Structures are given as structure tokens and as C-alpha cells.
Amino acid sequence: MGLGRARFYELYSNYLHACAHSQADAWSPGRSGGDHHPDWSAAVTALLTKLLSSKPASSYSAAASELHRRLGFQTDRASVRRWALQNRLAPDTRYKQAPQPVKRWQVRDWGALWQYDASPHAWLPCSLDKQVLLDLIDDATRYNTGARLYPSETLLSHFDFLSRTFQAHGLPLALYVDYHSFFYTHNPDAFTQLGAALHFYGVALRYAPTPQAKGKIERRHDYWQKRLPPLLAADQILELCGANHLLDQLLPHANQHEIHRELGTTPHAARDLALTEKRSVLRPAPACPWWPYVWSQRTHVRVGDDGKVPVHDQRHSIAAPPRSTVVRCLRPDGDLFYLQHAPDPKAKPLVLLHCPVF
């Protein structure tokens, strides 16, 4: 008959209704009117072919999201899957058991806790090396506040990522992290350099006892690992600069348009609701003169008897007495500063020497 399941049960319900009113002899199925959906444009089918033919191929949900982001064409995962099966472009994916619903603990306020983690993975196509994705997600709203790729996980990459994200969104009360040496020291009264930078601006560290305890950020890693490499392969993006440019476009789209399964709404809508209900503890990034030096790798250097300090493979004169101790600050962008003393909220920075990277 060529009827779909939904149409069949609709007719069956109408027939039973007619029988209940003694009108079975006069009942007729009528006409459905046919398929009113217009054919997909050439641009839509071309983009779908590109995304589903790449190695690895994009998932159906990722392809539907890209149609909306790039072409403004809104469809669902099921329609993309049906088109892919008809055109022999279905990715060869194994059956996965549907996840069981789990009620997870979460904080109440926007900005109370951000889950933070790094994901080493072969993000770039045709690359033998692994790159690192640094990722931040708000625990209350699932708002992905930041995601950026780096060649490796270093102290400078953490400084660069966190300072960017804090300037864009503000300062949370705490970060939820693991026991990596970047965050944790066995002395409870001491800070790592990264911990000291966070403490300077009132951001605490909370430690997850197991990887499973950081489930929200781990699932976000899985989301990016399934979505980003196929898109990079489809667009032939082979460098970190281009990959981060694509991430800057994907991140707001995911926050604003993709429904989160546990929340039943988009992270953007969840954040707006928290703001409306005055459930926000996020603080704006301060206009602090110490900001570029707090987010830098600092070491203490002794001025030589010649009144000079090392700068790369050279020695430069500095406005400090010989044999005195100064603070060397290496910025993520490569700029080098020498300060008279370490960051102190009760004082202002005194720059003794600045050596730009260019």
C-alpha cells in the first residue's frame, strides 16, 4: 500500500472512531494529500555528500547541525539518515545500546562550578601526532564556555586558554579538575603556578576523585571527538589555526541551537533562565594591571655582575642592581617581561625589561 506506520495507525484510529458511531459502512480512508515537503536543494545534497563521504564520516546529528549552521536549512537526524540510506552514504557504524537515563548531581548557579579538562587526541586529519583540546563547561547549564586546540598540554597553553575564556565570559567561583600536576600539589598549603594564578583572582580548585566524577566534561570530549575530526577532514583543514577558527564557529552554534538531552533545552536557554532567576555567581574579569603577568610562566632570575639577564640566546641590560633577584614572566604569545617583584594585589607591577617576540 505504500503507507508509513504513522499514516496506517491514523487511518486505523479513524476507522475505529467510525465504527463506534455506527458509521463503518460509510467510512472512507480519504486522501492524505501526498508529500508536501519540497526537494532538498543542490547545495544541501552537496554538503551532505561531502560530510558523509569524508574519512571519518560525520554522524547524522553532526550533518544536520552543519546544514543548519552553514545553509540555514533545518532538518533532523532521522531525515539525514533516511537520505543517506537512499543514496548509499550511510556511515558504517556499529549498533550502540541506548544510554539509560541517569539523574546526575549538579550545582544550582551559573558560574558556581566549571568543569575543566584536557583531551589528547589525533584531532587533525593525516597527522601522526596527537593534539590537545582544552575544554570548559558550566556544571549548572552545560554551557560550553571554551574549547581550543593546542599542540600539547603545557602550562602556557593552560594560561592562554583560561585567560581568553575568563575575559570572554567572566570568572567562576571554582574549577572542577583532576589530580594532574598542573593543578595539584601534595602540600595542602602550597599552590602550583596555575593554582596560584587562579587563587589570585578568587577562583578555587575542586578535585574529582575519579574520571567518572567528571562525567559532564568527559561526555563533551566524546562529543568533540566524534564531530570535529570528520568536519576537519571534510573541509581539508590540516593546521591548528584553521581548526581553532572552525571551533570558534561551532561552539556558539552548539550552545544556542543544540538541545541537551539531560536538560531538555539548549545550554544558551538554560543560561538565560539562570540569569532571569538571578542564579548567577559569575564575576566579570577585572581590569587588573597584573593580568598579563599573572597568566604567564614565572621564574626568579639573578641579575649578573654585568647588570644583564638572559633573553633567549643573548644577554640584555636591565634596570636592576647586579646580583639582585628579579621575576621573569614568559607570556603564552612569546613576549618576555622582567618585573621587580612577583604579582601582589597591594602593589602595581614595575616592568624592568620587555622583550617582545617580534
Where are these regions (language model features)?
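Basic, flexible linker segments flanking DNA-binding modules
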Residues: 13-122, 270-275
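Charged alpha-helix within mobile-element recombinases
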Residues: 194-284, 332
